[in-house]
Amino acid sequence: MKTKLILSALLFSTFTFFGCNNEQPNYTGYWKGEADMIFEVFTENNIDYTIRNVNGDLTARYEDNALRGKNSLNMDILMRVKGDSAYYEFGEDESGKIVTGYMRISKDEYDRIFKAQTDAKASYN
C-alpha cells in the first residue's frame, strides 16, 4: 500500500511538472516550407514580431499562444510553433483557411535561398 501511494504521488507530480509549462514557444529564427518558401522571424521584446521574406515584412503580436497579424492582403494570419515545426494559417473566411507547415533551418541555408530568390525577383522585374 505504501508503495502504491509513493508511485501515485510520483506519477501525479510528474504530470503536474510537465503539464504546467507556460513557456512561450520560440518563434524566432529561420523557417522553410515547400518549394523553398522561407521566412525569418525576429523580435526585440517577445511580444511584437517581424516576419520577413523576399516580398517584405509583416508585423505580428504574440497573443493567445500564437503570433497574430495581417498579411499584405489584409487577411488575418496566425503562426504557431511546436518545437522545430511552424504552422502558418491565413484566409479564415467562407472559403476556409490555408495552413502551411514549415521547419526550422540554419541561417546559412536561409541566406542561400534568400539570395537566390532575390536574384530571381530582380531578373524578373
Regions found by a protein language model. Name each.
Residues 1-5:
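Positively charged n-region of N-terminal signal peptides that target proteins for export
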Residues 21-23:
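Bacterial signal peptide processing site
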Residues 6-11:
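Sec-dependent N-terminal signal peptides
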Residues 37-72:
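N-terminal glycine/threonine-rich, aromatic-flanked beta-hairpin/loop signature
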Residues 92-125:
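Edge beta-strand at a domain terminus
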Residues 25-38:
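Tryptophan-anchored aromatic micro-motifs
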Residues 16-19:
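C-terminal motif of bacterial Sec signal peptides marking the signal peptidase cleavage site
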